[in-house]
């Protein structure tokens, strides 16, 4: 600063400052300027001090000498996840409480036995068998909502638990390279059997603290971008990708929406379809909506047995559709969220079996099953080329839905549209093409032949057939005269109708002689059809629409139907129901078209719409029609009868009514025939059962006679003395005695059977059945064996039971104790029952019945002898 005095007055630069504390040593500059102070030069010393707090020095995350072969193969300094040192506390689900009570009873019995020294092993074994049976029944018949609770079990193994159990090496990778690392999604490189994979999955917590840290496995956009980054990394280096799905859904808070939650999910969906490496998705818990799909667009979707995959949580669905959270069980049933339901819908590609009570009961075994499934799926996918992999992934999702989309197959449009421009000018009205005379004559000749075939020669006294023939000849002449333009006015359609009515009456009179083979109602219906085909409307000036079916085509269809009915009656078989239904549908279309034309011509379109609306409201409310509405309907029908084509409409309605009656009669006849057949079969079964009981009774009487009983006991004691369970250990003399005893029993039994009223035929053993059926029996055995193999390889339940049986046999070491033997027997019975239920095929049943039906025809058949107990052994 200059040594001369400086007066700080007036408007100086310091006046622009607004701070009241700016100045020299805390004195404002503005105050200094006003006071007119004179500043002298002096030495100024300025010192700046800062107090720094003591901070903890951060350690570098990478170890100076990492051990890649440490236990579990994980570089622990890259992951905060550690396996639990102690098993978690057991959590009892609501539906498991009955099992817990049984378990407490077993423990109480054991404590009592230890304290008192009383042997309660039998009671304990019985309770354990009962507990095991209840456990199997409970977990093999879980409802969808119960599987949801198992999938959400707090102790269920998480994604990183499986990584720790099934990988030789695993390095967790972090970050989305945009400044955030979402803990809800974990990912890393791992190796299985020497092959490197990129593993990505939702990570849930194992306690409340971990769940809060992991955000309950609900990812934010950062998590999906992190997953996409690592997928692209794996795609670049050629690592197959395995994703693990276990999330209730994407995190739906306001900030996630602002950061682009929907965009991140959509970006993942699009990018996953373009990955050039195999992709497998495994649902290990619950898969919720888009949060699961964002890492679930894979070539194969596998599901654990108790996992669920849904578009909306059952609780949310119940609240939306049924306005109550209590409707969650119904919603879970309707949503089809279980693994088995999704496998049937071809959404899931496979089911990985779980331990009996869920994956949380044996996490290590569960991880090994997942490992096996990954290896099998990867062996299949690695054989495909890159192009085939992408196509396979696309087709998997394209075929989803009710009908699915089949690629490369042209689809014919349901409604074709003519896009050609209409030519200028009014096209001439097309005239109705008349039915050819030859066709009408052929129709009448066929009808005449059908009626004459229905007569009996014994009814020639009345000779109604000749009267019908003359009536038809007269009808033919009238029709040919009517076709002549000069005589058309002389022969109106009413005369033709009168002759047809007369013809109908003559036939009905002839029908009373009970000589007609063809049902009268059918012939009458055919005459009505012919009448409508021949009758030409007097109003020939009306224009014919392009979509109208010509009368000749209707006549041909009715002729085909009549021929089918007549041939079906002559051959004692039913007429083709397809032709009848087709004719009815054709007539319905014609009636609807004529009705639409009549409504349009009478100007009743708006009235019809109004009436339909009022009738629909009345039906919806289950209320009768009001008198006013009935009057309006009656007025509508009267006005409709004035339409130009009303007579055509009435004729076609009558024809439709008659054909429908024929169909009803045929259906009724079919039902009656079916009822008679069922009754006959029932009577046969009852008679067979009665005879079987009678034969058993007679056999018991024969065996209970003192002489036979004494010989039987003597032979039995000799066989026991020889100590031979098969015939190879018996001497010739003893064999001879047994044969003689069998002959004596057969003779006594034959005498007893004759007293029942049955005939006995002597047939050598083994010759009572048809040798030609041997190939059929072998084929049936092969089919049954094939079905059993398919079920054993495809059913998760059967697989699990077989694995448990193998494990139980291995534990026993070939010498099972009573407890182990009971468990083995229980598992064997369960496997047999499951196989029997799964192989319950109608085709196999039919083959078996065809083979076994002749077995009861002769008494000496080996199977019948075994059935009534003749072939007893002496062991």
From Swiss-Prot:
PROSITE patterns: COA_CT_CTER. Residues 860-869 have a biased composition (Basic and acidic residues). SUPFAM superfamilies: ClpP/crotonase. Its main location: plastid. The keyword ATP-binding applies. The keyword DNA repair does not apply. Changing residue 317 to A: Loss of redox control, also 20% loss of carboxyltransferase activity in E.coli. GO terms for molecular function: acetyl-CoA carboxylase activity; ATP binding; carboxyl- or carbamoyltransferase activity. Residues 128-380 form the CoA carboxyltransferase C-terminal domain. It is found in: Plastid, Chloroplast inner membrane. Changing residue 313 to S: In strain: cv. Miranda. Pfam families: ACCA (PF03255). Residues 845-875 are annotated as: Disordered. Its EC number is 2.1.3.15. Changing residue 452 to L: In strain: cv. Miranda. Residues 1-50 form a transit peptide. Residues 664-705 form a coiled coil. Pathway: Lipid metabolism; malonyl-CoA biosynthesis; malonyl-CoA from acetyl-CoA: step 1/1. It catalyses: N(6)-carboxybiotinyl-L-lysyl-[protein] + acetyl-CoA = N(6)-biotinyl-L-lysyl-[protein] + malonyl-CoA. Acetyl-CoA carboxylase is a heterohexamer composed of biotin carboxyl carrier protein, biotin carboxylase and two subunits each of ACCase subunit alpha and ACCase plastid-coded subunit beta (accD). Component of the acetyl coenzyme A carboxylase (ACC) complex. First, biotin carboxylase catalyzes the carboxylation of biotin on its carrier protein (BCCP) and then the CO(2) group is transferred by the carboxyltransferase to acetyl-CoA to form malonyl-CoA. HAMAP family: AcetylCoA_CT_alpha. This is Acetyl-coenzyme A carboxylase carboxyl transferase subunit alpha, chloroplastic. It comes from Pisum sativum.
